[in-house]
Amino acid sequence: MSARTILLRSSTPSLLLLASLCALAVPKDKEPAPHFSAITTTGEKFTNDSIKGKVALLEFWTTWCGFCADEASFVDKIGHELAPKGLILLAIDVGESKKTVKKYLDLHPRNCKIVFMEDTNLAAMYAATSYPIYVVIDRDGNIAGTQRGAGGEDALRRLLARAGLDLPDDDSDSN
């Protein structure tokens, strides 16, 4: 038996246990959102208390994620379009240095509030390990829904509607 086979067989139970524990820790729909604090690149601070009465869209992304880059333009568009209806969009970069993110944003600007992972505990709370991940928190501070992976604009709009956001009737230009 090769060393690789032995390693795989011996580590599999540990990995399964770790995955199970992570799954148990992830907040579920209709549960209260975990207490958090996030500071944007412009110095704005967001907490559970500061978003009460609004709908929050937490977008977990990275600079190397192709799906994140593909979806960024419509995510930003939705964030801007629905801000007057009470939507707060926080784009949380996961696992990269501020220098890396700033360099990326110089080349690929975003029209939303950017949060560095090192300035928040949100990524750990939502077991952000694949990207993008979208989490919607409703006006009462509960998880309205979560989407792991790219799903397109229509899927994101449906997720936001679950939080009670009054979406415009005309979304004919959505993907």
Predicted feature residues:
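Structural microenvironment flanking redox-active thiols in thiol-disulfide oxidoreductases
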Residues: 69-108, 118-125
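Thiol/disulfide oxidoreductase modules built on the thioredoxin-like
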Residues: 104-111, 117-161
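N-proximal helix/coil linker or "cap" segments that precede and/or mark the start of modular domains
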Residues: 8, 19-35, 166-175
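Hydrophobic beta-strand anchors of alpha/beta hydrolase catalytic cores
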Residues: 57-58, 89, 134
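Short pre-active-site segment immediately N-terminal to redox-active cysteine/selenocysteine motifs
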Residues: 54-56, 61-64, 130
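A short beta-strand-turn-helix
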Residues: 36-56
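Bacterial N-terminal signal peptides that target proteins for export
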Residues: 2-15
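Conserved Rossmann-like nucleotide-binding pocket used by diverse enzymes
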Residues: 34, 47, 61, 88-90, ...
